[in-house]
Amino acid sequence: MTTSTQPGRSGTRTGPALATLALGAFVIGTAELVIVGILNLIAKDTDVSVGTAGLLVTAYALGICVGGPLLTAVTIKLGRHLLLWSALAVFLAANALAAATSAFGVLVLARVVSGAVHGLFIGVASALAAHLVPPGQQGRAVAMVFGGIAVSTVIGVPLGTLVGQQIGWQATFAGIVALTAVALVATLVLVPRVGITGPAGLGSQARHAFAPRVLAQLGVGLLLLGGQFAAFTYLASYLEDVTGISGGVVSAFLLVYGVASAVGVFGGGRFADRGAARTLVVANLALALILTALHFVGKNPALTAVALAVWGLVGFGLVPSFQLRVISLAGPGGDLAATLGASAVNAGIAGGAAVGGWAVESHGVDSVVVLALTVMFVALPATWAASRWLRPPAAEPTPSETPDTTRTAATDAVEAPPRPA
């Protein structure tokens, strides 16, 4: 196993390494979300209904939520560099399989594998990003990884959808394969070889990663992401039915949200460095107020556009703080916990979409914003309590570490919240 070279201390390779991790996240984010834009094409070519084709979205989410932590658990003793390029290699193979087949069952399998590798890569990449930089810069480092995903929604997904519509959905997957190959080579060349950043044993990692303080923070994340996506999943329908816009104007409004989200992730990294726990509380309160405002101004297109921009900034701006907080609270189990954080984000998205769907069917599309703002207000006491009462454990050097590798992403990551008065 390789040992840490602590490149973040010298800064000689940190920038290119973080950019490479962001590139990998961009490719993975594109692959996850582009399926929505080509779903009808796949349904037609594979002779299934659009509803059945939607299983490709479910399969990917299942891979992230279940497969990601499982893969992390069985590979916990491997070096981070090896895991990153191996994950990209498997991701490349899975998408190559998707590009080469017209069998729906094979596509589902490819999506499950891709999702599992997605969970592994994002968890390892975010923990490694925090490990590569000095204290005080780790929020921005984690934001680079999640920023890659955010940028994919603005650039990768629209381009991938366009390729699918003009050439064919297999060409979209072929493009993902090509981009993955670039990210793979860049990872081999530019990402430092770093060994494990916590205890080598699965039992020790799991004991810290599944500690009550971490599970409580994951629960907060589920509420924050789930509440947002209860509304966002049906935003296009909301804009058409409530705001009264259609066609290209809806796309423009969604683009406003997407660009704001990308900006929010990168900006959110700086706030995470200043205080991740505090940032989550402020973001939670802001989201509750923004969604309340959207409920009252939803029929006014101009004010709705402003609300969407602020929502995107804040809603995605909290993600680096959430992930960094999870890593911090896990202490020596930060590597495994990082994957749990990524899984919680996707579980929140899936759960929010499901509950939002129930609201649409039962009460109409205008109810999803009310549902989302209600969840935000319900989450606020939990977010505040987590920020005040949950504290990272003390640093624990382990037998697998030398004096040069005892620094972990967790021990440097986030300030301990103030002790209760």
Residue ranges of predicted features:
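Conserved MFS/SLC helix-loop-helix module at the cytosolic interface between two early adjacent transmembrane helices
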Residues: 66-102
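Paired small-residue
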Residues: 90-97, 105-114, 302-310
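Helix-to-loop junctions at the C-terminal end of transmembrane segments
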Residues: 68-80, 264-276, 360
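C-terminal transmembrane helical hairpin of 12-TM major facilitator-type secondary transporters
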Residues: 278-322
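C-terminal membrane-cytosol helix-exit motif in multi-pass small-molecule transporters
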Residues: 177-197, 382-387
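Helix-breaking motifs and short loop linkers at transmembrane-helix boundaries and internal kinks
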Residues: 47, 79, 100-106, 244, ...
